[in-house]
Amino acid sequence: MKRFQLIEIEDQTWLPNSVRDALTDYLQFMTYHTQPYAPIVPQLERALEQTNTRQIVDLCSGGAGPWLSLYPALQQSGSMRVLLTDKFPNVQAFQRAGFLSNGALEFIAESVDATDVPDDVVGFRTLFASFHHFSPAQAHAILSDAVEKRQGIGVFEATHRSALAILLMFLTPLLVLIFTPFIRPFRPSRLLWTYVVPVVPFVVLFDGIVSCLRTYNPTELQVLTAELSSGTQYQWEIGEQRAERAPLPVTYLLGYPTAAEQINGREGETATLYERRSVNFSLCISGFAPRHLDRSAAIL
């Protein structure tokens, strides 16, 4: 099936933040409970070992992505830190993720462009369910930026460019209607955009189908990385990993410098970055969490 770039509604700057946040909250809820990225934990763990780092910079984090379930799995092999970022940061969702992870998940409240990550944001970069949003030129820029700044990068996509994946997307409006009452924190705007004016179910379906049509397959990922491998000490791994009983595989791309010491030399700079940016999380603990969260309640 041919790849189409197309346009997703969630990417548009004119979309109200309340709608975008409702979308990312739903996606994060479903990701947490279905755990589609559990199969790639060994690959990600191996990449972290190759780069000799336990610091992750998650790009295009949406509502915090899969990290509430992935972090405990990765934490078993050693302490680590995760910094959530996005071009349109869902700060309330980031605060909630930080609270539920006891501060392990930190965030940047300002916009971060995945194609040009600030120099002081250092760590192994990850993109979950977001790489397909970018055109080939933008996707190349994301990978090139990681290569130029000598940072490892991992791309993971649970969507698939196939007839089966598109057919499964037609179930999503029903899932939105069923699970929205269970999504926390409660927002009146989420009920408005889901049940009164059903924008969220429509956008989840529309963007889901478009996401499938935009998803890069392994061959296309190899084309994107081909020239980046020329003349650089950078290693790429591309493949698919299927979970037991899962209808579709997860497509992944891993890239990292072969000279890991070039990353190690900047870890002190990363610590400074986390100390400076983590003010956001301390505000979450002192103000946001007690009013809105109860750990004894359902997580999501």
What spans do the regions from the language model cover?
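A short, conserved alpha-helix within the catalytic core of class I
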Residues: 134-149
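A conserved beta-strand element that flanks and buttresses the S-adenosyl-L-methionine
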Residues: 125-126
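Class I SAM-dependent methyltransferase Rossmann-like catalytic core
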Residues: 1-53
